[in-house]
UniProtKB/Swiss-Prot annotation:
<comment type="similarity">
    <text>Belongs to the purine/pyrimidine phosphoribosyltransferase family. PyrE subfamily.</text>
</comment>
<feature type="binding site">
    <location>
        <position position="84"/>
    </location>
    <ligand>
        <name>5-phospho-alpha-D-ribose 1-diphosphate</name>
    </ligand>
</feature>
<keyword id="KW-0808">Transferase</keyword>
<comment type="function">
    <text>Catalyzes the transfer of a ribosyl phosphate group from 5-phosphoribose 1-diphosphate to orotate, leading to the formation of orotidine monophosphate (OMP).</text>
</comment>
<keyword id="KW-0328">Glycosyltransferase</keyword>
<dbReference type="InterPro" id="IPR029057">
    <property type="entry name" value="PRTase-like"/>
</dbReference>
<feature type="binding site">
    <location>
        <position position="142"/>
    </location>
    <ligand>
        <name>orotate</name>
    </ligand>
</feature>
<dbReference type="InterPro" id="IPR000836">
    <property type="entry name" value="PRibTrfase_dom"/>
</dbReference>
<dbReference type="GO" id="GO:0000287">
    <property type="term" value="F:magnesium ion binding"/>
</dbReference>
<comment type="pathway">
    <text>Pyrimidine metabolism; UMP biosynthesis via de novo pathway; UMP from orotate: step 1/2.</text>
</comment>
<comment type="subunit">
    <text>Homodimer.</text>
</comment>
<keyword id="KW-0665">Pyrimidine biosynthesis</keyword>
<feature type="binding site">
    <location>
        <position position="88"/>
    </location>
    <ligand>
        <name>5-phospho-alpha-D-ribose 1-diphosphate</name>
    </ligand>
</feature>
<dbReference type="InterPro" id="IPR023031">
    <property type="entry name" value="OPRT"/>
</dbReference>
<dbReference type="GO" id="GO:0019856">
    <property type="term" value="P:pyrimidine nucleobase biosynthetic process"/>
</dbReference>
<feature type="binding site" description="in other chain">
    <location>
        <begin position="110"/>
        <end position="118"/>
    </location>
    <ligand>
        <name>5-phospho-alpha-D-ribose 1-diphosphate</name>
    </ligand>
</feature>
<dbReference type="GO" id="GO:0044205">
    <property type="term" value="P:'de novo' UMP biosynthetic process"/>
</dbReference>
Amino acid sequence: MKALIDAGVVKFGRFVLSSGIESPFYVDLRRALGHPDLVKWVVSGYLSALSRLKFDVLLGVATGGIPYASILGYLLQKPFGYVRAGAKGYGTMQAVEGADVAGLAAVVVDDVLTTGNSLINAIKAVREAGGEVVGALVFLDREQCGSQNVRRETGVEVFSVYKMRELLETLKPYIGEGHYRAAVEYLAKWSC
């Protein structure tokens, strides 16, 4: 687990998230891509969580979910593709690329879940393309009401490999008491 810190996947300090929320920690799973041993560990976690779901196609959420959905699709020999943040304004003008999802049971894959907005938009895009979303899978749920927001807005259950508090417990020996306490206190402010 120390490798997550060493590779810069998990950082502590002051960060502004894509949602505009300020946070004392940042998790960037894209950084794992430069470390094959970490990719193997991340993919193993995703595979374990996916074993609970029956699906036909995997779709990564742009951009963090794309590499992992691709690897998972390849390993499981399932069709895969990705969901753009918005439909292209040219060519086919599609939001869902890669596999044709019409009539298929899809799992939407992302790296980190905060508010749930990216997943909500991706689920809506898959449905508009004729797919049935049977679940959403993230590596890390930051426990900031994202899974509840997704369920409330779309009816789709979010599965995660890790919850942030679990990850913090595991990382505690490597991050120091100050960072650990700041992160736990920050998470305690979120009531869903």
